[in-house]
Structure formats: structure tokens, C-alpha cells
Amino acid sequence: MTMDPKQPISGVKLVRPEERIMAAAQTAGMIREEAIQTDHLWVGIARTKPGNISNWHHHGDWETVAYVIEGACRLEFGHGGREAVVGQPGDYIYIPKGEIHRESNPAEGEQALVIVRFGGGPVVINVDGPMAG
């Protein structure tokens, strides 16, 4: 259930899996489903098939936390994309504002991440590579 960012949320909201929508902003190699969006909050799920690698992107003025619920998430970042972390189920990955990165799924099964973002502006900005931006 996407909420109009211009309308404040009043009260508790329940969003069931079938109510999530395809997020407007996508990156090749992964699928994002939006559950909640307000002026300064974005919550959803991202899925990546085994062996897939997303394109390089960043999240502008949004701080991002990813919680790994299935599979594994390799996140490449840093100068030239030479740094990486690999999150397993139960791990959290923090991505600061504007950090150019890409995700891949090195596991044999599908990767699923719960994503929570706080900030504003465009949620996803796709770029040509780790040195772009």
C-alpha cells in the first residue's frame, strides 16, 4: 500500500505482501517492491535471483538499511568498487547517503532484503559505474 507522501500517515497501517507494489525506481538485476513511502521514509523488499548483479546506483539523500532475510547479499562500494561486504540472513547492511554501490547474489537461492530508507528526493539514481556521480 503506497501512501501519498503529501498525506501524513495517521494511525497504524498493515501492508500485506499482495499489497506491495513494484517500486517506481528500479535497477537492472534486482526487483524492488514498495510497501510504505512517505516524505522521508521508504520501506520495501528487494529480490535478486542467484548469480545476478545489479547495475551501479546510489540512493541520493537517503540513508539505507538492508536486512538480509534470504540468500546472501554481496555489496560492492568504495573507490572503484573495490570494497565489499557479504551479508547473510540475520545481518544488517548500512549504506550512507550517496554511496555508489551494486548488489549481487552469490547464493544458490533467491536473495531477499528488507529495505528501510530515511531521507528525501529520488529514491534510486542509476549511474554508469563506481566512479560516476
Map each language-model feature to its residues.
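Beta-rich strand-turn-strand
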Residues: H79-V86, S104-G109
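A short, N-terminal "cap"/entry segment at the start of jelly-roll beta-barrel domains
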Residues: M1-I45, N55, N126-G133
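Residue-level recognition of conserved beta-strand positions in structured domain cores
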Residues: I45, H58, F77-H79, N105, ...
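Conserved short histidine dyad/triad with adjacent acidic residue
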Residues: G44-G60, K97
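A short hydrophobic beta-strand segment most commonly corresponding to one strand
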Residues: A46, V65, Y94, G109-N126
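Short, conserved beta-strand element in jelly-roll/cupin
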Residues: R47-T48, G60-L75, F118
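Histidine-centered metal-chelating micro-motifs
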Residues: I53-N55, R74, I93, K97-E103
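Short acidic-glycine-tyrosine-enriched beta hairpin
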Residues: G81-K97
